[in-house]
UniProtKB/Swiss-Prot annotation:
It comes from Danio rerio (Zebrafish). Signal peptide: none annotated. The keyword Nucleus does not apply. Involved in ciliary process assembly. May play a role in the trafficking of ciliary membrane proteins from the Golgi complex to the cilium. Regulates the platelet-derived growth factor receptor-alpha (PDGFRA) signaling pathway. Plays an important role in spermatogenesis, particularly spermiogenesis, when germ cells form flagella. GO terms for biological process: cell differentiation; cilium assembly; intraciliary transport; protein localization to cilium; regulation of platelet-derived growth factor receptor-alpha signaling pathway; spermatogenesis. The keyword Coiled coil applies. It comes from the Eukaryota. Pfam families: IFT20 (PF14931). This is Intraflagellar transport protein 20 homolog. The gene is ift20. PANTHER family: INTRAFLAGELLAR TRANSPORT PROTEIN 20 HOMOLOG. Its main location: Golgi. Residues 74-123 form a coiled coil.
Amino acid sequence: MAKDPLAEAGLHFDELNKLRVLEPDVSQKTTELKEECEEFVDKIGQFQKIVGGLIELVDELAKEAETEKMKAIGARNLLKSVEKQREAQHQQLQALIAEKKMQLERYRIEYEALQKVEAEQSEFIDQFILQK
């Protein structure tokens, strides 16, 4: 089989009979590769858009989570504060109860002493009246 002198020189005709430097199958594969690359670039662009949207969503969720976390910390601190206030109030009331108990005991002792004095005075009055 005789070789084409143009093919030996590296020149080829395509399906439209245009003169090409590349072999037709190499040219076809190059075109296919170019199309695949364009598709790949388009898909990468779509992927980047999707990932960008996901990143924004995750950022928003992170902000919301941080806000809720701060609210929870604030509520916990408020609860601790209320608990401390109640404990302080409880201690104050316990001290007041102890003070009132002591006062009640003093009043009871004073009452008993006054009853004793009253009994003695009544006895003295009775003896004084009987002596007359």
